[in-house]
C-alpha cells in the first residue's frame, strides 16, 4: 500500500475548521469506566495537532458489537470522560452520531474543544457502508481524518463511503502504522524473522504464504504448530489439529525449502491431559507428543532455540501467542518470545507486533510497549496489510 496518493494530516487545510476524525476507541470498559486507555492515547498526536490548529474536533468511533441496535452497555459516554482526562479540554458528548443530536452538540462546542459522537454501530447502516448514512456523518465536519488503523480493513460508512462526501487524509497514527509495516516488508534489515502463532493454520495460510517471499526465518508456534509437526511425521497426541490442513502445511514447508527460508517449529512441548490450568503438567523430551496429552505451550528447549535465532535477526514481526498464555502454566513460551523481542530491540533490531493477542501477552507479562519498535493497534488490519490485501479505509482516500 503506497501513501503517495493519500493526503496526510499535515497536508490538509484544517485551521479553525470543524474536523471529523474516525478514531478507534473500541476500548475495554469495567464498572462503567475505561479499563485501558491505550487506544485513546494512541490518537493523541493527531487530536493535539487539531486542537493546536484551533479546530473543533469531532470524534467518531465504534465500541463492541451492538449489531445495529442501541444498547446502553456499548455507549461511548464513559469514553468521553476518559477523552477529557487524556486531552485536558472540554469534551461534549452527542447522544447520536447523526441528525439533530449530533448537529446541536457540535454547534454548542467551541473551537479548541472536542465532540465525541455516540457509537457508530448503533446504526446497521454503518457496517453496510451505506452512502445515505455516510452523507449524514459527513455533515458533522468540513474535513475528514482517518485515524483508526484498526478498522481500515473494513469497508464501513465511517471509513469508506464518508470519503465520497468529505475530502480528507490520514492522521499520524495511521501514517506510522503504514510506514512501519510497509518499510518492514518492503526493505527490511536482514535477517528478517516472522513469528506466527495462534490456534489455526486456516486463519494464517495467506499470511504465511506472503511471508515466505519476504522473510529469512519463519518461526511457527501456538496451536497451528501441531498441524505442521503432524505433516513432518511427529505424533501430536490429542493436541489441536487441523487434519484437513496437513497437506497445506506440507506445501508451505516445501515452498520454504525452495525459497531458502529457515522454518523453526517447537522441539519440545509443555503438555497436559486437559485444557485446564488445574490438570497435571508434563514437558516432552522431543517434538513428539504422547497419546492422551495435548501441547499447550512450547518447552524450554524450544524457548532457547527461538531466543538464539531471534537475537541474530535485524527485523522481527510477531503475530499470535505460542501457547495458551491466558493460563499461568502455559504462559512461559509467549512471555519468552516477548522478552526476546525486547532484547533484540536493545541490540538494534526493528521489532514489530502485529496487534491482537500478542499485545495481551505484553500486558500480562507487564512489558511496556515502548520497549519494542512498534506495536500495531490493528490486529486484523495489520495482518491484511502484511498479506498485501487492499485496505478499503485507505484506498477510499487515494484520490
From Swiss-Prot:
One of its GO terms (molecular function) is phosphoglycerate kinase activity. It catalyses: (2R)-3-phosphoglycerate + ATP = (2R)-3-phospho-glyceroyl phosphate + ADP. It is an enzyme of class 2 (transferase). ATP binds at residues 204, 295, 326, 355-358. It holds the Pfam family PGK. Transmembrane segments: none annotated. Pathway: Carbohydrate degradation; glycolysis; pyruvate from D-glyceraldehyde 3-phosphate: step 2/5. The keyword Nucleotide-binding applies. It is found in: Cytoplasm. GO terms for biological process: gluconeogenesis; glycolytic process. It comes from the Bacteria. Substrate binds at residues 24-26, 39, 62-65, 121, 154. GO terms for cellular component: cytosol. Signal peptide: none annotated. Gene3D superfamilies: Phosphoglycerate kinase, N-terminal domain. Belongs to the phosphoglycerate kinase family. Monomer. HAMAP family: Phosphoglyc_kinase (MF_00145). This is Phosphoglycerate kinase. It comes from Elusimicrobium minutum (strain Pei191). The gene is pgk.
Amino acid at each position: 500500500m503506497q501513501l503517495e496518493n493519500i493526503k496526510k494530516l499535515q497536508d490538509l487545510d484544517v485551521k479553525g475548521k470543524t474536523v471529523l476524525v474516525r478514531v478507534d476507541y473500541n476500548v475495554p470498559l469495567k464498572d462503567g469506566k475505561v479499563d485501558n486507555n491505550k487506544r485513546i492515547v494512541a490518537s493523541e498526536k493527531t487530536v493535539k495537532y487539531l486542537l493546536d490548529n484551533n479546530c473543533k474536533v469531532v470524534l467518531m468511533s465504534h465500541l463492541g458489537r451492538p449489531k445495529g441496535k442501541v444498547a446502553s452497555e456499548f455507549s461511548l459516554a464513559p469514553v468521553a470522560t476518559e477523552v477529557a482526562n487524556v486531552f485536558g479540554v472540554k469534551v461534549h458528548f452527542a447522544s447520536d452520531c447523526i441528525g439533530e443530536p449530533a448537529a446541536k452538540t457540535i454547534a454548542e462546542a467551541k473551537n479548541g474543544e472536542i465532540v465525541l459522537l455516540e457509537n457508530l454501530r448503533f446504526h446497521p447502516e454503518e457496517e453496510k457502508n451505506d452512502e445515505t448514512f455516510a452523507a449524514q456523518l459527513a455533515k458533522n465536519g468540513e474535513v475528514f481524518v482517518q485515524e483508526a488503523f484498526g478498522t481500515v480493513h473494513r469497508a464501513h460508512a465511517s471509513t469508506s463511503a464518508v470519503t465520497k462526501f468529505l475530502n480528507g487524509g490520514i492522521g499520524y497514527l495511521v501514517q506510522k502504522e503504514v510506514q512501519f509495516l510497509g518499510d518492514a516488508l518492503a526493505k527490511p534489515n536482514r535477517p528478517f524473522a516472522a513469528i506466527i502463532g495462534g490456534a489455526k493454520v486456516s486463519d494464517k495460510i495467506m499470511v504465511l504464504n506472503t511471508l515466505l517471499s519476504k522473510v529469512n526465518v519463519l518461526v511457527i508456534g501456538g496451536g497451528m504448530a501441531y498441524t505442521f509437526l503432524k505433516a513432518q511425521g511427529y505424533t501430536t497426541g490429542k493436541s489441536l489439529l487441523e487434519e484437513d490442513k496437513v497437506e497445506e502445511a506440507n506445501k508451505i514447508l516445501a515452498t520454504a525449502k525452495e525459497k531458502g527460508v529457515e522454518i523453526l517449529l517447537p522441539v519440545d512441548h509443555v503438555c497436559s491431559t486437559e485444557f485446564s490450568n488445574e490438570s497435571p503438567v508434563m514437558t516432552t523430551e522431543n517434538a513428539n507428543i504422547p497419546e492422551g496429552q495435548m501441547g499447550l505451550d512450547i518447552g524450554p528447549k524450544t524457548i532457547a532455540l527461538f531466543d538464539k535465532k531471534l537475537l541474530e535477526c535485524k527485523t522481527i514481526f510477531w503475530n499470535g501467542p505460542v501457547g495458551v498464555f491466558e493460563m499461568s502454566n502455559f504462559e512461559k513460551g509467549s512471555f519468552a518470545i516477548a522478552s526476546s523481542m525486547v532484547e533484540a530491540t536493545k541490540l538494534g533490531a526493528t521489532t514489530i507486533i502485529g496487534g491482537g493477542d500478542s499485545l495481551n501477552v505484553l500486558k500480562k507479562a507487564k512489558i511496556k510497549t515502548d520497549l519494542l519498535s512498534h506495536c500495531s493497534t490493528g490486529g486484523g488490519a495489520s495482518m491484511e496489510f502484511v498479506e498485501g490485501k487492499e485496505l478499503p479505509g485507505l484506498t477510499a482516500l487515494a484520490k
